[in-house]
Amino acid sequence: PVNNKNQIIPMYTYPCYEWLDSIDWTDSKVFEFGTGYSTIWWQNKKADYYGVEDNGEWYHKIKEKSKIKYETDLKKYMKTIYDYDFKFDVIVIDGQVRFDCIKPALKKIKDNGMIIYDNSDWHKSSKEELDKTDLIPIHFHGFKTMHVDSTTTSCYIGRKFNKKANHIIPMGGTIREQHSTDKSIL
């Protein structure tokens, strides 16, 4: 999947993608449980990217360009994040054993970080587990590329999250003049 500039985009819901795409992620440490098109997108955003993948075919396609580990033992898969002696700015849960990846993610996320949980509407127990934390949930409902039904990508942000989104022009949208009601008349 690509955007209107022919750049690969992650398979998050469009509202989530647009918000994430408006933020500068340069040098942010990102870990992803389950890699995919988002791997390429995060790297294009100049993030310091790490991940774990259990699909050998995909792993061999992208291993040269990234710090991804290949792991098919799912107990080891969910613990791969502990191989790093630092915490992450962003942790994406979008692969196998999602529920079991929550605890490791919570231990390895920075106070000002964010956990992205894709398809949270498909995983009620996982969503409820994340909702119990002190993280602030933002649920982006909508369509996503290559899907015919809507879904939810949830971002759980730390209370010290300090990344600022730039002005968002929706995909297919146009830049317009400032609307007359967007100014004070007083």
Question: Positions of the model-derived regions?
Answer:
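A short acidic, Gly/Pro-enriched loop at the edge of an enzyme's catalytic core
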Residues: 81-90
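SAM cofactor-binding core of SAM-dependent methyltransferases
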Residues: 10-76
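A polyampholytic, Gly/Pro-enriched intrinsically disordered region
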Residues: 68-79, 92, 137-144
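Short catalytic-loop micro-motif centered on adjacent basic/acidic residues
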Residues: 29-32, 51, 90-93, 115-117
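Class I SAM-dependent transferase core
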Residues: 1-9
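Short, well-ordered alpha-helix to beta-strand connector turns
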Residues: 27, 46, 66, 88, ...
